[in-house]
Amino acid sequence: MNGFCIINIDNSIEYIGCVKSVTVERSIHMSHFIDLNSDLGESFGNYTLGMDSEVLNHVTSANVACGWHAGDPLIMEATVKMCKEKGVAVGAHPGYPDLMGFGRRKMAVSPDEARAYMIYQLGALQGFCNQYDVELQHMKLHGAFYNMACVTSELADAVLDGLQAVNPNVRAMVLSGSYIAKEAERRGIPVIQEVFADRGYTEEGTLVPRTEEGAFIKDPQEALERVLMMVQEGKVVTNTGKTIDIVADSVCVHGDNPKAIAFTKYIREGLTKAGVIVANFQNR
């Protein structure tokens, strides 16, 4: 055919000649992107928890404890500074005021309390981000706060109210497919749908409770296969053997001991070998 072609904005190709024009579809290979996040800054005073400097070599986003379930002002500042030096995006990791229970115990809090908890903790970390000229990329709840906000509408609403009060541009990193994820999207809050490399899933899309069989995936190869399935196919096999749909924007990994560091490194290397681009949301 004589003539020329125009590549349209919808990725179709239109051939234009003297006699006729015809439109055909163009096949485009879309690369998969994924973020790797980890909970950091959870030391406190003289007590050291985790291997933050090591895990920062393998993740792209950090969830920084804000002083209530773990962390303190000096740890928060040091973690933000270290993230900047290593090119890792910073996120706030607010929890319940429960140092003794590491924020994993359920608490009965009112919507007003939950909203204030958010403003208090995010505001503190935002101050350190300002000090080092670092963008606060996201917010991810911790422990019981995270789990309860996934299924309790009043709590989720209060959390999002607090987030929007501090900075409406900060992304909400939330459990994929949860109530809080849907409500954040409805409000127009940027959402990061989170999945877990080392946790089992129920048919409802929630995490298998830590006390139940199948809660943890300990074999690195099995974990990698599950992560690749979630990232590339949008599916995960539950603890009953059923396959359900899931959206994966970020994968949570851990780095609180040498074995966990090796696990995280294995996941990242496996993603890269599979052609998945590992990057945070500021570097895309």
Where is each model-derived feature located?
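Glycine/small-residue-rich loop that forms an oxyanion/phosphate-binding "nest" at active or ligand-binding sites
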Residues: 99-132, 138
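C-terminal domain-boundary segment and adjacent tail
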Residues: 170, 264-284
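Active-site rim beta-loop-alpha module in soluble metabolic enzymes
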Residues: 177-235
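Glycine-rich tight-turn/loop motif centered on a GG-T
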Residues: 48, 52, 62-69, 100-115, ...
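Flexible, glycine/charged-enriched surface loops at secondary-structure junctions
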Residues: 129-137, 234-245, 277-284
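Conserved, mostly hydrophobic/aromatic
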Residues: 39, 93, 139, 253
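Acidic (Asp/Glu)-rich catalytic clusters
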Residues: 53-57, 78-91, 130
